[in-house]
């Protein structure tokens, strides 16, 4: 999704986060750790995935401010990276993952809120983003990623109810 303003970006994030939280509220802890939501991943694993991508985006920004270009994964590297993320977090408890996800979401919001509209939307404003606007690196890890997660969770819930 292309955003024309910081306000629209923040509103989309707030809306999708609330929708995700509402969807999660209907699940029991047992359901949230059951595999099979997205391949072998559980809802907990999806939240760990979202958290890790938040942390990577925060790192990219912080590294970029030092004048260094962060190692942002190429499309061909995403699948192996996601497998590593799963392996890294699979043994964490649901409580740990929920807490980490909520914390990283807040940190992303704080970063976005700290940026002016010009900083957020102007291509090349930050040298590390080259010709892109910084929103290009932040937006895929927020509302659109939440929509991706909700799509998998909803499909899984339908399958679960059908059984």
How would you label these PLM feature ranges?
Residues 10-13, 97-101, 139-142, 146:
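Hydrophobic packing residues in well-ordered alpha-helices of helical domains and bundles
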Residues 1-19:
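Extreme N-terminal tail/first-helix region
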Residues 28-31:
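Active-site flanking loop/helix segments enriched in acidic
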Residues 2-6, 87-91, 131-135:
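A short, mixed-charge helix-start or loop-turn motif at secondary-structure junctions
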Residues 17-25, 54-62, 102-116, 147-150, ...:
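Structural signal for well-ordered, non-membrane alpha-helices
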Residues 81-121:
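Acidic/histidine-rich alpha-helical segments that form the ligand environment
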Residues 33-80, 120-163:
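Short, contiguous alpha-helical
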């Amino acid at each position: 999704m292309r955003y024309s303003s910081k306000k629209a970006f923040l509103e989309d994030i707030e809306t999708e986060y609330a929708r995700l939280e509402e969807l999660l509220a209907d699940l029991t802890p047992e359901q949230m750790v059951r595999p099979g939501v997205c391949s072998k991943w559980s809802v907990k694993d999806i939240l760990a995935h979202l958290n890790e991508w938040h942390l990577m985006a925060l790192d990219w920004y912080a590294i970029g401010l030092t004048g260094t270009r962060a190692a942002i994964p190429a499309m061909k590297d995403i699948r192996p990276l996601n497998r590593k993320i799963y392996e890294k977090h699979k043994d964490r408890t649901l409580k740990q993952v929920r807490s980490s996800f909520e914390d990283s979401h807040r940190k992303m919001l704080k970063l976005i809120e700290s940026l002016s509209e010009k900083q957020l939307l102007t291509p090349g404003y930050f040298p590390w983003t080259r010709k892109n606007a910084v929103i290009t690196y932040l937006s895929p890890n927020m509302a659109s990623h939440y929509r991706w997660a909700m799509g998998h969770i909803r499909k899984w819930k339908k399958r679960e109810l059908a059984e």
